[in-house]
């Protein structure tokens, strides 16, 4: 399984981010390429921050959702829900220009990849160990890069 704990997988995601262009069209959903990089950036920032997590109620227990999302070799479904802080109209969701936003995404990505013992709760998955976060970090970026055919 690919995870950001493996340098090759982290380099793959970084390269795919660098190949994005502002004119890339979404294969699903409503985001533009620039909005997507802002969303992914803020997801890493949120994961890095020491702020309270508001749990999202799902029809299955968090452990089950986490297992399906992080352990099974299937892509995440299109247009899944997100936490309010990562929605396009969230107060902290500020997109400026594509190149600048991509640079800040790469900075937050690099900070996230540099973590060595990250544990905190996730709004959907509950308790997460460092290995879970590194897997999530890969899968979340991969999901949105595939959204833009990268």
For the regions a protein language model found, what residue spans apply to each?
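Globin-like tetrapyrrole-binding proteins
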Residues: 1-7, 17-18, 25-28, 77, ...
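A short alpha-helix capping/helix-coil boundary motif
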Residues: 11, 102, 119-121
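Short, helix-capping/interhelical loops that line the mouth of catalytic, cofactor-
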Residues: 49-104, 112
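Charged catalytic carboxylate motif
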Residues: 12, 39, 104
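Short amphipathic alpha-helical segments and their helix-coil junctions
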Residues: 12-23, 45
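Short, contiguous alpha-helical
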Residues: 23-71, 111, 115, 119-150
């Amino acid at each position: 399984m690919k995870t950001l704990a493996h340098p090759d997988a982290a380099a793959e995601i970084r390269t795919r981010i660098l190949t994005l262009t502002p004119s890339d069209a979404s294969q699903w959903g409503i985001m533009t390429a620039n909005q997507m990089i802002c969303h992914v950036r803020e997801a890493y920032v949120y994961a890095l921050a020491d702020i309270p997590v508001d749990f999202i109620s799902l029809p299955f227990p968090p452990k089950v959702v986490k297992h399906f999302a992080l352990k099974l070799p299937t892509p995440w479904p299109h247009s899944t829900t997100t936490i309010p802080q990562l929605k396009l109209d969230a107060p902290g969701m500020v997109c400026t220009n594509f190149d600048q936003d991509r640079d800040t995404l790469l900075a937050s990505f690099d900070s996230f990849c540099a973590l060595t013992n990250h544990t905190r709760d996730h709004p959907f998955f509950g308790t997460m160990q460092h290995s879970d976060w590194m897997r999530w970090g890969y899968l979340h970026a991969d999901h949105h890069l595939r959204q833009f055919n990268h």
